[in-house]
C-alpha cells in the first residue's frame, strides 16, 4: 500500500480508533519484548497488571512521551560452555580465524578499551546496532588508530539518526537497509581481516617486530577463553554497554564473497527439547509468521491432475437423509435397480449402472452383517445409514415439504404450538417497538408513488356515482308504495330531496355539521312517512333499514390515532444495545488483556475485517482425490490437466474402442444359454416386426453380443401386463433372430463354453422342423401382413395359455375328504444304526451300477441294430471315439493307448497273424480281407473294452467297406508281404489307416 493510501486510511479513522490501534501495538510490543520471560509464566493476572501499568505510563492523555530506555531489553541467553572456543591448536591459521569470527559473532561481547569509554560518554540508545569485533590481540586493540574511532562514531551517529526517523514514521514500519547504512569500519574489518592500522605517532614494525607480534598472538590465543569470560562479566556489569550490545550488526555482503574466506565452519546444533510456550505468545507468533496458502495458480496452465473443491455460499450444507440398511436390502430384493433401469424410457448411462452395482454391493454387505449377527459376531451399535442415491437426487417438491412438516409434527406436536407462540411474541414485540420508537425500527422500503390527477378525478366521480345510486332503490320503493295520484307531487319533492342529499354529502365531506343534522331530520321524516307502509310489508317480508346504514357518524366522535414518536437511529441503537441479552460484545468493553487475547485468537476470526470480505477465496482442500462430498448439489469439482504439450488424438471417433463396441478383438460371438431340448417339440415361433429387427441390430452394435442387456432393452414393458409366447424377447430368442438376419453367420464363429450346446440346439431344431413340417424358428412379419394376423396369433396364444392353465388345474389331484388321514406314528420309528446305514448305501450303489449296465447294454444293442441296417452314418457324432493313426511298433504309443482320451488312437497291442482262413460272409473278397477286418476289430476292442466282439467286427467291416478300392488292394499287398517274414523289416513304415483318416477321405468324396 502506498503512503498516500495509508494517509487516506488513517485520515478517515477517528481519534478513538487511532488510540485503540496504538494500545494494541503497545501491547504487542510489550509481549514481544518479554517473550523470553513469558515462556515459563504461570500467573496471567500479573501479566495483565504489568501490561496495564505499561499502558498507563505511556498514555497520550497524560502528555508523557515514550521513553525507549524504559522498555524491557531483549537479552539473549548465554552461550553454553560446549560451544565456546576450544584451545586445542595454538597456531592462528586462517581456518581458525574464520571459526573464531563465527563464534564471536554469536556472543555478547562489548568493545573494550577506548571504544567502551566513548560509548559510555555518548550514552547511545538501546536499538543501536553493535559492531562485531575482529579477532585481534590485546596489542592490536591498543594500537588502533584514531581515524577508525572517528569513522565509527560518525557511522553510529548516522545510524542513530536513521533509527529516530524510523520511529517517527510508525512503530511497526521498517526502513529498507542499504549498504550505505553500514559503518565503513565494519566493512573494513570484514573485508581486510589481516591489515592493521597504526597511529601516526607510531611507525610500522619491522620484520623482526612482526615475528615478535606473531609469537605474542600465539601466546594470547591460549588465554583467549578466559579473557572473553572476563569481558562478558564486564559487559554484564555495565548497563550502558549491555544496552548497546542488545543488537548485532549484519554485514552487507555474504561471507562467501569476503577476501581470504573460502569456506565457513559450521558447528553442529545441539539437540534440545522444545519448551512449551504460553498460548498468547504462540497465537501472536502464528499471526505474524502465518503466510497465505495459494490454493489456485491462475498463471500456471501446466498443472497436472490438480483437483480443487469449490464450495458455494451456503456450504456447509445439511447432508441428505439416509435409510436403514435393512430397508435398502428389502428394496433391492423386491425391486432391484438392475431390473428397473432397463425399463426406463431415458438413456442408459454409466451412473445408473454404477448405482445398481452399488445397490448389489450393499445387499451383499447387509447379508454378511445378518450372518455375523446370527453368529453373535456383530456389534450392537447401529450401523451408519446409507444415503439412497435415488431419493437424494430427486428434486424437492411442495409435497415433500408437506410430508416433512407432517413427520416433524408427528415427532413433537407441542413444539408447533411453541413455535406459533414464539411467532406471536415476536410480532407483539415488533408492534410495541413501533409505538415506542417510531418508524426507526421499521424496514426501509420503497415509497409508493402518489396517484396522478386523472386517476383522482375518476375516483371522485365514481364516489359520487355510488352516493347517488344508493338513493335510487329508496326512490323506487317509495314510488311503488305510493298511489299513482300522488306520483307527480312526490316526484318534484323527491328530486329536490336528491339534490339536497347530494349537497349535504358534499358539505359533510368538508367537515360541516349542518349536513349531518339535515340527514338526521330527513331520515326521521322518511321514517314517519313510511311507517304505515313498512308495517304492512313487515308482516309479509323481513327488510333491512338502509337509512341506518347511510347514517354518518359525527366526525367529532372519531378516534384519532396518536402521533408516532420521533427518535434518531443512534438513540434507538443505544437503547437496543443496552439490553442485558445480547449476541455480541464490543472490544472497548473488554479489559486490555481481554482485548489483546481476542485480537490474537486465530480461530475466531469473525471480528476481523479481513474475514468479513466475501470476495476472498476460502481454502477447501479434500483429504483425497477419491473422496468426494456426499452432497453433490453444493460442491463442484474442477479438474485441471496439462493440455499444452498434449497433441490432439489422431484416432477418429469411429475407430475408438470402448467397453460395448463391437470392433474390439475381445468381443467374440458368444451365444447365451440354450434352452432345454425337452420342450423343443412344443415350441412356438416368435414374431418379429421390422421395427423390432432394427432395434435388435442397434442394441447388438451398442452392447456387443451382451445378450442379457439386449434382451432387457428389447423387453421394455411393464411386468404386470400379459406377454404371449410370440412376443417374448429372451436372450436366446434374440440370438436366434440375429442368426437369421446375419447372412454371413458361421457356426465356427461361436466361442465360449456355451457354443457347443448352441450348435446342438440349432442342429436339432432344424432337423425337427424338417420332420414335423412345422415352423419353430422366429418369423419375420412385414408391415403389410401385420394388421390381423399378428393380433389373431397373440390372442390365440393367450387363449391357449388360459386353456392349459385350466386343464392343469382340473387334472391336479384333489384330496379325498372321505378317506381319514392316518396319524403319524412316532413311537414305532427307530433310528437306523451305522451298520444299517452302510447296508442301505451299498444297496443304493448296487442299484445304480445295475441301472448303468442296463442302459449301456440297451445302447449297444441299438447301435448294433443301426449298423446292421446301415443307417448309422460314419460321423464324429455317431463314432467320436474311433482310433487315430499311430505307429504300431512304438512303445510310447502303447503306453498312451492305456491313458488315451476320446480323440487319441492307440495302435495294435500285438502283431497281426495272417491266416489262410477264408471269410464266411463273402467268398469274392481276397483271402487277407478277414485279417484286415480283425485288425480293425482288435483296435476297436483295445480302445473300447466295453464293446462286444460282434459289434467290433461290424464296425471294422463298415470301415473296410468305406475304403476305396486302391487302398484295399494296397492293404492286401502289405499283409501278403508281412505274412512271409516273421519279423517286420524296419524299412516298412506303412500302417493301417485310422478311423479319422477314413472319415476325412469319405468326406472328400
From Swiss-Prot:
Residues 72-180, 193-214, 222-241, 468-543, 807-844, 874-930, 981-1005 are annotated as: Disordered. Component of the NuA4 histone acetyltransferase complex. Pfam families: HSA, Myb_DNA-bind_6. This is Chromatin modification-related protein EAF1. SUPFAM superfamilies: Homeodomain-like. SMART domains: SANT. GO terms for biological process: chromatin organization; DNA repair. Disulfide bonds: none annotated. It comes from the Eukaryota. It is found in: Nucleus.
